[in-house]
Amino acid sequence: MKARIRPYVQACLVLAMIGLIAASAYAEPYELSKNDVMDPKAIKSPDISLFGVKIGDSEAKAMDVLVNEKIPGIKVEQEALFIFLVDQRKPTGPMAGVRVQDGKVDMIFINNRFAYKTRGLFRNVLNSESPEDIRKLLGHEDYGDENVMGAVLAYDKQGFVINYLGKDVNIEFSPVH
């Protein structure tokens, strides 16, 4: 009797393992420096990570990953609520970082100085020439404001805001509203 049941139990375990692996692959976050996600509808701020740090992670994890682990080519600075990542080649200002409030990461930001490290759709956004180029990549924003100085494109349903100021493009990821 045991000999007959064993293959069925093994088959069930194998199928369960395959299901778990597939589910974890589907829920994999968009690591800004690694993944080539190109579907704008698939991007939500809770799935975004910056060198492994996601919105909602503890301050301890952010400090450990961004400050204590050495990231090649990046200098880390901490000021008040922010952990800034600065390009060692051209240390003109932060190229990315996180904001920590109440012991948790509540915002991730990147700008066009981080474009060379970014993969996927946001590399194209950071290298955009106009707000219209950004709309072609991401679709029309939930709301925004455009004037002679630049544009603010808010994609609140996905949890990010793009500030376009001529040559400077900033993207802020925050919890979905």
Outline where the language-model segments fall.
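N-terminal signal peptide c-region/cleavage motif recognized by signal peptidases
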Residues: 22-24
